[in-house]
């Protein structure tokens, strides 16, 4: 089921990313850079391990995990979090927890595009990615 997400994805649209970053406590300068950055996300599967690489002019990150198994993650904004990723109804649901807080990153396929919905408290951001050839 994760196979539907495999590929190289380029950000083409972003809504409310600044509000989401503000909610997380990301500083002004980093938010300015984050808002201008158009990252590429590469999703790979190797056996039962999923690898998600995010590449941009600002920062490159990589996580690898097994579905349903908690792992330690350092986010692009340098938060140290406990993460778990599950498949739920065709959606890849990634939950990060730290310091009593929680954020979710939900990836789903809609009309051949990868839609990433980021939620922290009342802040909801939608980012749309198109598959690269």
Swiss-Prot record:
Mammary epithelial cells of developing lobuloalveolar structures and heart. Gene3D superfamilies: 2.40.128.20. This is Fatty acid-binding protein, heart. Its main location: cytoplasm. PROSITE patterns: FABP (PS00214). Belongs to the calycin superfamily. Fatty-acid binding protein (FABP) family. The modification Phosphoserine is found at residues 23, 83. Octadecanoate binds at residues 127-129. The modification Phosphotyrosine is found at residue 20. SUPFAM superfamilies: Lipocalins (SSF50814). (9Z)-octadecenoate binds at residues 127-129. Hexadecanoate binds at residues 127-129. Disulfide bonds: none annotated. It comes from the Eukaryota. The gene is FABP3. Forms a beta-barrel structure that accommodates the hydrophobic ligand in its interior. The modification Phosphothreonine is found at residues 8, 30. Keywords: Acetylation, Cytoplasm, Lipid-binding, Mitochondrion, Phosphoprotein, Transport. One of its GO terms (biological process) is long-chain fatty acid transport. FABPs are thought to play a role in the intracellular transport of long-chain fatty acids and their acyl-CoA esters. GO terms for molecular function: long-chain fatty acid binding. Pfam families: Lipocalin. The modification N-acetylvaline is found at residue 2. It is found in: Cytoplasm; Mitochondrion matrix. One of its GO terms (cellular component) is mitochondrial matrix.
